[in-house]
Amino acid sequence: MILYVIRHGIAEERAPAEDDGARRLTPRGRQRIRAAAAGLRALGVQFDVLLTSPLVRAAETAAIVTEVYGGQPVPRELPALSQGAPPVETVRALQPFLRHKHVGIVGHEPGLSEIVALLVTGSPEGMAVSLKKGSVAALELRGRSPRTHAKLRWLLAPRHLRRIGRSVRKRLLPAV
């Protein structure tokens, strides 16, 4: 089973009196996530299930990924992906989805890095991982239990995903 860990795109700055969960992606954030998702698609990444934090910026990121993938799969909210959720609880909440071959999760830092570390080393502090906004990590989970250690297959920054998407698009477009 492959777990794709996706950090949400660039979001609006938080105003002092504003609800953090209501922050939306900026126009630049939307454009960059769309380009990064095109890179994922060019790499052959598939999603049987796409789970998202209920926070607006993560849900918007998941919706853009789905759009780039032709409307499937429809993102599902998973409250355990909310900002500040303990990584052990989040991994436990992923258990019912491990029967699928390709699962994507969209969420927030530092939780996503802690999930990657937990799955690879057994501890949320077991390794230093940093997911920039729009980054994606691919983990190979052995067996159906998140307690088995995962293998980090790759971790790509958003700029690399955008380049991959652009290079494939250039090859597919006819010369003028």
Where do the protein language model's features map onto the residues?
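Domain-level recognition of soluble alpha/beta enzyme cores
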Residues: 123-151, 155-158
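Generic beta-sheet signal
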Residues: 3, 99-107
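Charged phosphate-binding loop/patch that engages nucleotide di/tri-phosphates or the phosphate backbone
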Residues: 148, 152-176
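Glycine-rich phosphate-binding loop signature in dinucleotide/nucleotide-binding domains
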Residues: 43-45, 96-101
